[in-house]
Amino acid sequence: MQSVSQVVKTSLPNYLSSLPVPDTFGGWFKLSFKDWLALIPPTAVVVGIGYVTYRAFYPKAHRTCKSGSGLCNENVRKHEAKVVDMIDIENIADKAAFCRCWKTKNWPYCDGSHAAHNKDTGDNVGPIVIKKK
């Protein structure tokens, strides 16, 4: 414990006070190459702590697919500006499941592709099921 106390009370303050931090903004332009090299280690430590903190508190809701594109629709009718399907309810036999994850190969009907999508992204999307009464 004494070694930790020595580092915190003596070594670290001595190291920080010996760093060539200028008093004015213009002083940054007068630093030599050796002074800039001396500032790299503490800057790297501060950046590393900032990055680790950012990753620790980064919301899990912002995860994207393995492809990393962030798009919902990656392959269904990309030549159209907006994908819209009109389905007459009278044409549905008993019930129909419609895709909401855009991963199906049988568009607009669900083929269960959302299971892999949910596993990859942590999402919980499922189909829209329409039944006849």
Curated annotation (Swiss-Prot):
Record's cofactor remark = Binds 1 [2Fe-2S] cluster.
Which SMART domains has this protein been placed in? ZnF_CDGSH (SM00704)
Needed co-factor(s):
[2Fe-2S] cluster
Record carries keyword Transmembrane helix: yes
| Membrane-spanning ranges | 36-58
Record topology, Cytoplasmic segments: 59-133
List residues binding [2Fe-2S] cluster: C99, C101, C110, H114
Q: Which UniProt keywords apply?
A: 2Fe-2S, Endoplasmic reticulum, Iron, Iron-sulfur, Membrane, Metal-binding, Transmembrane, Transmembrane helix
Q: Which residues face the membrane's Lumenal side? A: 1-35
GO biological process terms held by the UniProt record: intracellular iron ion homeostasis; mitochondrial transport; regulation of autophagy
What membrane topology was assigned to this protein in its record? Single-pass membrane protein
Under the heading Pfam families, the entry gives: MitoNEET_N, zf-CDGSH
Record's subcellular location: Endoplasmic reticulum membrane
Task: Specify where it is mainly localized.
Answer: endoplasmic reticulum
Keyword Coiled coil set for record: no
Q: Name one GO cellular component term.
A: endoplasmic reticulum membrane
Tell me a Gene Ontology molecular-function term this record carries.
metal ion binding
Q: Where on the tree of life does the source sit, at the highest rank?
A: Eukaryota
UniProt-listed InterPro entries: CISD1/2 (IPR045131), FeS-contain_CDGSH-typ (IPR018967), FeS-contain_mitoNEET_N (IPR019610), MitoNEET_CISD (IPR042216)
Family note: Belongs to the CISD protein family. CISD2 subfamily.
Q: What is this protein called?
A: CDGSH iron-sulfur domain-containing protein 2 homolog
Q: Which organism was this protein described from? A: Drosophila virilis (Fruit fly)
Please state the gene responsible for encoding this protein: Cisd2
